[in-house]
């Protein structure tokens, strides 16, 4: 039995993590975010009602679940207050269910200004960030000049630290990026207005998780973005600014790494990517348009159209290695309904003619890489909403089996629609 279960994306994000986390939290007592910020976009559909969460863990909708934002998350007070209000307006008592680590770095207005100024300066070489200040906030954290939730307990010292760091960043904005300076007093006033709310939710997360482990409580760790966007192991520099792999759980929450029991990789039945960066299996034809339309592939956070392509098992195998995956949850299988044939990328052809079955490391090494496909028969029958494996077409079952063969990891959960009831749990991670 696994008490601590990690749910993370195995591709470039947008795999459908939110629904699965919400489904599995029926048995969890805690749900923990351990990296990223409000650049995430987790969509839940419950009884036909759609909820999009960017910062607060997906377990917040559950009455008996405590949601935790761990130290690995960069926290925007403005984004958190907005999300809290939206949920509270719907009758969800967020403050009774949400806890924060005092070590969470704060995202403030100058981080957003820097993010946008840098993307503008890059021009055609822009990374495609969400423009929400995520990267600059992590940069401040590593440079040891960042302000954290815990700093809000001493308001006078916070004001002094803020003044110092803003002088540094405003100098960059004005003199290097030729942008407007950010107003110190406004940032201070806005932050002080919510300081007491933030500090009232602070808890020692590492200690709480250790006590939960000793009691045998079920804990779900909710990843954001996807493995191939990891700052160290992704398609650098077209990556996010945090560790999206399973290793980020320990550093981003304070849980001892030996206590991770099961890692569930969310795997979309095809591939998508938002923004710039390598994508060997990308489709530019009518099939790509079909996947985009049928899958409603527009970002929950940015609204941007996602790039689409066939499932890339070479890249997914890298995710298997990096995360020591226990099992997959296959999502959006129904999007492939109606295609005469489906393809799996099983290898890459390098510019020098070599065939490889492992991914390059840096973005520059992906240049000229061509996908090598294996083609399988598609299916005309609908898989939408199917709740039993026996109800799937044989061609869909063959597709599932081939993914398992190519990756060496079992598919333990199959999602056939956006509602949490439209799911087959073949093996429950908490029972594995």
UniProtKB/Swiss-Prot annotation:
Its EC number is 6.3.4.4. This is Adenylosuccinate synthetase. GO terms for biological process: 'de novo' AMP biosynthetic process; IMP metabolic process. Its cofactor is Mg(2+). Belongs to the adenylosuccinate synthetase family. Coiled coil: none annotated. One of its GO terms (molecular function) is magnesium ion binding. Substrate binds at residues 300-306. HAMAP family: Adenylosucc_synth. Gene3D superfamilies: Adenylosuccinate Synthetase, subunit A, domain 1 (3.40.440.10), Adenylosuccinate Synthetase, subunit A, domain 2 (1.10.300.10), Adenylosuccinate Synthetase, subunit A, domain 3 (3.90.170.10). SUPFAM superfamilies: P-loop containing nucleoside triphosphate hydrolases (SSF52540). It catalyses: IMP + L-aspartate + GTP = N(6)-(1,2-dicarboxyethyl)-AMP + GDP + phosphate + 2 H(+). It is found in: Cytoplasm. Homodimer. Plays an important role in the de novo pathway of purine nucleotide biosynthesis. Catalyzes the first committed step in the biosynthesis of AMP from IMP. It comes from the Bacteria. PANTHER family: ADENYLOSUCCINATE SYNTHETASE (PTHR11846:SF0). IMP binds at residues 14-17, 39-42, 130, 144, 225, 240, 304. Binds 1 Mg(2+) ion per subunit. Pathway: Purine metabolism; AMP biosynthesis via de novo pathway; AMP from IMP: step 1/2.
